[in-house]
Amino acid sequence: MSNNLSIIGAGAWGSALSIALYDNFDTIYLHTHTQADIKKLKSKHSALSIPYPYNVKIAYDLYKLQDSKNIIITTPSYAFSEILEKIKPFINHTHKIAWGTKGFDTTKRCFLYESFKRLFPNRNGCVISGPSFAFEVALNKPTALVVASIDENTRNHFAKLIQTNTLRTYTNADIIGVEVGGSVKNILAIAAGIASGLKYGFNTQAALIARGLSEMSRLGKSLGAKNSTFIGLSGLGDLVLTCSDNLSRNRRFGQELVNNHNIKNALINVGGTVEGLNTLDLILSIANKKQVEMPICEQVYQITQGKITPAEAVNYLMSREQQQNNE
């Protein structure tokens, strides 16, 4: 089998990885089934409007997975379990599977890792996460990523596989912590966008990041994650990035909520998947079961349900009972 890679999902992140990793492989197969993606691929322009390298090939059918021993899934989280079910008939003992999808499986209402183990109980999956805007990765801007798996060989394999001169990889055994960070930061980015839309300043943004990190850590700890994970790349690093720049669709969505007061119009204006909105209900459901307080995430939920205005949410957060800074 040649040194090939299959990336499932030709959106922004899948396209970025195919562009950034082209020199590591003989051929990169980019799997898609939508006519819009096929048209872009035929014109050699990615979802990021950046030309694909010569060795990135469109794959119409999943049988092409047989030509690659390494697979990276980059579909939105709501499609993750469906993709796993579709690829299962094509997977053999030589394949190694990772995913760059962030969020929870909202279809099965569980971690992506749990969905993976449900369908592939005898395999060790791997998540690729960290502060990484797709557009900057495609432009070869220096970026650091976390590669997490409970299996040391699996995480080391993918860490070496995707490292380049501009992609630096770090390994982590705490796959649950990495997935919690990648999910919760999207909700907090919506909150940051709301604050930006309300014309609040850097003080507010800093407070949101710091207190949001506390919410993320509390939830992760209740699920067995390590606190150290949340002060690393997949926690604090990704949170700062996603809350600070409008390359984040979640942040733009928060701004649009303030400007439009309408979820449907906000989503149209953002023009892409808003993972924070998709996973919000599930995250809060888990938090309630674990009796974990997540006031910022809760206020984002109330806003998206039309129960309160953004300004009312801020007033509530500012008037909560006083707490110690380490809580």
From Swiss-Prot:
It is found in: Cytoplasm. GO terms for molecular function: glycerol-3-phosphate dehydrogenase [NAD(P)+] activity; NAD binding. InterPro entries: 6-PGluconate_DH-like_C_sf, 6PGD_dom2, G3P_DH_NAD-dep, G3P_DH_NAD-dep_C, G3P_DH_NAD-dep_N, NAD(P)-bd_dom_sf. GO terms for biological process: carbohydrate metabolic process; glycerol-3-phosphate biosynthetic process; glycerol-3-phosphate catabolic process; glycerophospholipid metabolic process; phospholipid biosynthetic process. HAMAP family: NAD_Glyc3P_dehydrog. NCBIfam families: PRK00094.1-2 (NF000940), PRK00094.1-4 (NF000942). Catalyzes the reduction of the glycolytic intermediate dihydroxyacetone phosphate (DHAP) to sn-glycerol 3-phosphate (G3P), the key precursor for phospholipid synthesis. Belongs to the NAD-dependent glycerol-3-phosphate dehydrogenase family. This is Glycerol-3-phosphate dehydrogenase [NAD(P)+].
